[in-house]
Structure formats: C-alpha cells, structure tokens
Amino acid sequence: MNKRICLLAGYDKKNVVQDYVLYLARKLSKISDVYYFADGHFTQKELNKLRHYTKYAASCPHKTYDFGSWQCLICHIGWEKIMMYDEMIICNDSIYGPMSNMEDIFDYMDLRDYDFWGLTENYNSNYHLDSYFMVFKKDIIKHPKFHEFWNNMMPTSNRRIYESVLTPFLTELGFTGNSYIKNYKKEDQLAYPLRLFKTNRMPFIRVNTLKYPAHNLKEPILYIDTRIENETGYDADFIRKHLESEGLFEGFGLSYYAKKSFYAIKNKFSDWVH
C-alpha cells in the first residue's frame, strides 16, 4: 500500500466534532496518516475526540474555507515531511461516509496511472475536479509550483475559486488528472447519491444534498435516511444526529423541508374543505 497523508478540513457552526466526522476520520486513518484542522474555535475537549484517528488536530478561525485549513496544515507539517509520502489526500467534512471500501477505489485509480484524481468532476464555471476529496501523487507533491500554489494562497470571499483553478493549474503543468466517476451529462452528480452508490460504489454523500434537499437532492426524499442505511450499510444515525443538531431533521425519514411542505399542503387542503 502506498504511504499516504490526508489533510482533513473541518467546520461546524457550533464548534463540535460531529459523530459522522469521527467516523470519517476513523476510516481515513485506515488508509492514511490523518491531520485535521478546523475553521473555528473548537475546544481542546472537542479536538481530543479525534486523538485516536489523527496525528494532529487543531482549530483556528481563518474564514478562508477548506483551502485555508489545508494551507494551515501544510504550514504546520512542512513540505519536507509531506514529500516523504507517496500520495497526498485533501478531504473535508462536507461528506457523509465512507460507504464503500476506499482501498478498492485507490486500486482502481492506481491502474489508470493518473497524477491526480478526484471522485467526481464539475462543469460549473469551468471543468474541474470536486475538491471534497482529491488525491495527488508523488510527482505533484514534489513539484515547486504545487508548493507555490499553497504557499501563496490569499484570503478570499469566493469559497470556490481555488477549487475551480486547481485542476487547470495542474493540467497546465503537464500533469494528468481525472475523476473516479465520469460526468458525461454535465449534471450535478452529487444530487443523485443512491444512484451513484448503486452504479459506482460512490463512498460519500454530500452533506448539503441532505441538508438542503429542496435544492440539492434529485431523488425521492421520503425515508431517504432508511434507504441510505439499507442500500449502503452506512449507519444513518450519523446523518440524523448531525441534521438534528442543525435543526433540519425530524426523524421518520422526512427532512425539515419535506415535512414543512407536507403540513403546508395539509393546511391548504383543510382550508379548502372548510
């Protein structure tokens, strides 16, 4: 197995390390050395939850999103140490999972001999790999221009800017990248979580897909938590607890939005009847 380092970026508006994040870190620690950095004021007690799964866990409010947390970790670890690894993973906690064997995905992508890869690809604004999970091989890790990209990163209010430029930046340097799941329809792939799992054993579900289903989910929402658990084997309590902590979920497989819509329709119908 290749020696991997994983830079895990975190954020929680209540400065809590959620259970689903602990599970994510635990699974990532099986395939890599995990370093965690959160944007916020996390207490040491919260960060200590990660002590069994990470080499380092810290937090600081920097307001530069995931790339800011990854930059902080790179500054802490140093390129000399990072270059000792065969692969560098960047990952954030905007995903539930994993729901499938990550080593199988690494084996599959290793056969294709890419210099960098992600799980999904995106055509918004320009073609790029989604940065919630990306992998960089040794030649990129050692490249001075890659170091400059991270070292020279500046604060920005555009949370997508660095994600959208990273893929073309590496391509212009002569590196070859691709996605594990191809997006031939140029659609929002992550809006179809169960389809992606069935067809590609997609290991993750985007948090915002379930957090804001009215805008981000294009599959039936009723009992989505139970269906996820039954079809993927992932403990849906991680999802329920997280969304409940956000005030967006009320059990029985109905999101806040779906339940709100249901009662709105019910009240409207009652008005008509009376």
Tell where the protein language model's regions lie, with residue ranges:
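ER/Golgi luminal nucleotide-sugar-dependent glycosyltransferases, focusing on the catalytic module
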Residues: 1-274
